[in-house]
Every structure is written in C-alpha cells, then in structure tokens.
From Swiss-Prot:
One GO term of the biological process aspect: IRE1-mediated unfolded protein response
UniProt xrefs under PROSITE patterns: SHSP (PS01031)
Designated name of the protein: Heat shock protein Hsp-16.48/Hsp-16.49
Organism field: Caenorhabditis elegans
Family: Belongs to the small heat shock protein (HSP20) family.
UniProt keyword Nucleotide-binding, yes or no: no
Disulfide bonds: none
Amino acid sequence: MLMLRSPFSDSNVLDHFLDEITGSVQFPYWRNADHNSFNFSDNIGEIVNDESKFSVQLDVSHFKPEDLKIELDGRELKIEGIQEKKSEHGYSKRSFSKMILLPEDVDLTSVKSAISNEGKLQIEAPKKTNSSRSIPINFVAKH
C-alpha cells in the first residue's frame, strides 16, 4: 500500500523550521546571498588584449613591492603576493595568486611590469609583429 504524506503535516513543518534555523546559523551570508550577481572577474583587475598589446592591471595596494613576485613559465604568467605580519599580539597573513595564460601572439621576451604609487601593478607585453613580407620578383634577361 502506497502512503502519501501531506506536505502540511506537523513533522514536515517542524523539519522545514529546523532547516531554516540551522541553515541561517551555519551559513548566514551564503544562504541569503544573491548567487547570480557574483562577478569573480572583478578580482582579476583590468585585462586588455588588443591588436598591439596584452596588459593586466591589478590593485595590489595592500602589498609592498617586495611582497610581490611575477614569474613567466612559457605562456603562463603567475602573479603572487604574500604579506606576513608578526607582533606581540599575534600573526596575520594576506596572500593572493593569479595565473593568466598569455595569448600566443604575445612577444614573451618583452613582458615588463611597473607599480604605481597608488599600488596599481601593470604588466604588459607587445604583440609579435608580423614578420612576413613581400619579396619582389625581378626579371633577369639572359645575354
């Protein structure tokens, strides 16, 4: 015999009530957040990829230049920042790591970086120039 349970039965209402209470206590922000509005690209900064160059700008204002490291392995650009503070009151650590795959037409030998007084890290590289050229055909008459 198949027994159907009413959605309005006492145990279902109690289960729903307990789920609401424990969920809001365990995950108060995440549960009520609008998950459709998250924009993770804001964390990257500004990326420009046009005909002449590829560039990335990051806000690293919370880091000193000596806390930053930029490495290029093939076309993989890795940007890291690690900041550690120790005091008599405790220890804190702040870090980030970004990996960006550079486009194939970027001149990897010309990648450069600079940081502004405001803490904006700019990494850029020109695009490879088209090395093909037209070769004229000269007519040589035999004597």
